[in-house]
Amino acid sequence: AEVCDESRFEKTTKGALDVLRDLGGDGLFTARNDEPNWGKAHRLLMPAFSPSAMRDYFDDMVDIADQMLTKWERLGPEVSLDVSDNMTRLTLDTIALCGFGYRFNSYYQNEMHPFVDSMVRALREAGRRSRRLPIQNRLMLSTTRQYESDIEYLHSVTAELIKKRRKLAKEETPTDLLSRMLNARDPLTGETLDDDNIRNQLVTFLIAGHETTSGLLSFATYLLLQNPDVMARAQAEVDRVLGDGPARYEHIAQLVFIDQILRETLRLYPTAPAFTVTPKVDTLLHGRYPLRKGDICIVLLPSLHRDPEVWKQPERFDPDRFAPDAIDKIPAKAWMPFGNGQRSCIGRAFSLQESTLVLASVLQRFEIWQPSSYQLKIKESLTLKPEGLTIRARVRKHVARPLASRPVSRPVQTSSSPEPASAHGVPLLLLYGSNSGASEAFARRIASDGNARGYTTKVAPLDDYAGKLPKEGVVLIVTSSYNGQPPDNARKFCLWLQAVPAASLLGVRYAVFG
């Protein structure tokens, strides 16, 4: 936990990540902390991973998942299915469609899209280059030519995506990740992203957005096959929540045991298995071990996640470690598959939603089994995946959804707005702290209801009212936190609140939603 203290340590891109900059440049994953484009892109892209954005992505996720499941159904139970191959196709197609409106159509061709081939070769070579002496890399002319050719192809594909999107008329432009990168302005600086950085972000999202999630789904499949009792519980939950109908966005939050399975899978097999940090100044680790500024510390997640002082029987697959009544007992920094602090994975919600949908959909439609015995072999590049894992899948014969789980018919509402009330004019100030936009949207929704009930409402960021909270009327604060830190538009407010004498706030009527 000590090296995860962001007041003392920060992410470093020295070593392997420095070589990965050949592919991703100053994209979110490989950007250095002092590069302006990191903060700008992070602030600008946070709303693209908000709860409202996740709802918008859901139908496209279903589209791609259905392509995979339809192919399995048509191939039939006599055909062995390569799990990692199928999940790689699925996650690549999903991030491309949800994020950029592009279809790789991986399930309509036998070979992987050339983008995947180039990406895999480039990632493999980047890892090797980080372990070689510089002179070795310079002497390997043929290997270097292939490496540079693969990177050029990755960049050309993403540059073409940008070019095509810029040609679309405004009414034809989808609301997705790419459109946000092209059009949105950084709320702090007012600047937009340049095309080179957008290209780097596209490469980053296409690589990181599908590699890690495909590994998660592949390992989860393996662990379910090894633990049939867990698979039976998961299938029972899916039958109760989904029945034999199509998955809906609202189902995701109800698939609690599926979520536990995914989190326990990430404990045992974190698909991004390490991250590196460096001390900001010379320091002592654990009060004993001297570290100099610039030294590299590697946090190995498979070891961290198997600490016997935290996890009983750490090698055992037990999703109940993450049950609702147990998850709060897990010590901070004991489970970190998405990294640490402000440099943690921005796409965490996207990955978990996609994985929950896909795993539930597989269990809803199929009985799966292994055609032969399998000894786990892990393939490592930038991420971890099980190598050579195959399954067979037979369409299930469904039973009707239990009566208690059937949706209850409700009267049709002609309007979602409250009944108008006479205007009494009491001031209602809605203050929000929000990077992703979710808290701001909730504040504006409350304001709309307040107007209908006769209040005089105003909505503003928390920072606008640092030092001047009104004592007239009511103040409602709607805010989130990010890795223990205030949102960008609430920093000044938090600093003021920590220093202000308590007596000066007497008379302020307030409530906090957080």
Predicted regions span which residues?
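Cytochrome P450 heme-thiolate "Cys pocket" and heme-binding signature region
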Residues: G24-T30, V203, A208, P246-E250, ...
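Conserved cytochrome P450 catalytic core segment spanning the I/J/K helices
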Residues: S50-S52, Q146-L216, E250, L255, ...
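Cytochrome P450
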Residues: S52-D63, E73-L97, N105-P114, Q136-V157, ...
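Cytochrome P450 proximal C-terminal region
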Residues: A65, L69, D117-R121, D239-A247, ...
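Conserved cytochrome P450 K-helix E-x-x-R motif and the immediately C-terminal K′/meander segment
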Residues: S156, E160, G245-H286, P308
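Cytochrome P450 catalytic-core helices
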Residues: T212-V230, Q235-E237, R348-Q364
